[in-house]
Amino acid sequence: MRIKRSVTSHKKKKKYIKAAKGYSGAVGRRYSLAKQQYYKSGKYSYAGRKNKKRDYRNLWITRINAAARAQGLKYNELIHGLKLANVDINRKMLSELAVNDPDGFNEYVNIAKQSLAESVQ
């Protein structure tokens, strides 16, 4: 008996067309383009997950720098001062403090200033 593959090929094509639903132009309708875009989208999403980590770290550092400069200290001086004082706090938490609890952040800035002054002497 001869085997026909119309059911399997239709299922396969339907899978990619369904995944590409919402894509603009012919990419959402034509099988070959939809399949290419499906794989490309996977690459983009993988790279995006990696870039998101970088972007958030940059955002935290920018926020910390802005809040530290308002207190008369640069970002690198603040981080160095906290390291000298053996304060173990990450940039995400420092950023949250800078945005939501300025008084708490100012305490960390004062700790950094004191440890920097002690290291100079």
From Swiss-Prot:
One Gene Ontology term, aspect cellular component: ribosome
Record carries keyword DNA repair: no
Protein's UniProt keywords contain rRNA-binding: yes
Molecular-function GO term, any one: structural constituent of ribosome
Keyword list, A-Z: Ribonucleoprotein, Ribosomal protein, RNA-binding, rRNA-binding
GO biological process: ribosomal large subunit assembly; translation
Disulfide bonds, paired cysteine numbers: none
CDD domains from the UniProt entry: Ribosomal_L20
InterPro entries from the UniProt entry: Ribosomal_bL20 (IPR005813), RIBOSOMAL_L20_CS (IPR049946), Ribosomal_protein_bL20_C (IPR035566)
Domain of life: Bacteria
NCBIfam families: rplT_bact
Listed HAMAP family: Ribosomal_bL20
Role of this protein: Binds directly to 23S ribosomal RNA and is necessary for the in vitro assembly process of the 50S ribosomal subunit. It is not involved in the protein synthesizing functions of that subunit.
Family membership noted in the UniProt record: Belongs to the bacterial ribosomal protein bL20 family.
Name of protein: Large ribosomal subunit protein bL20
Gene: rplT
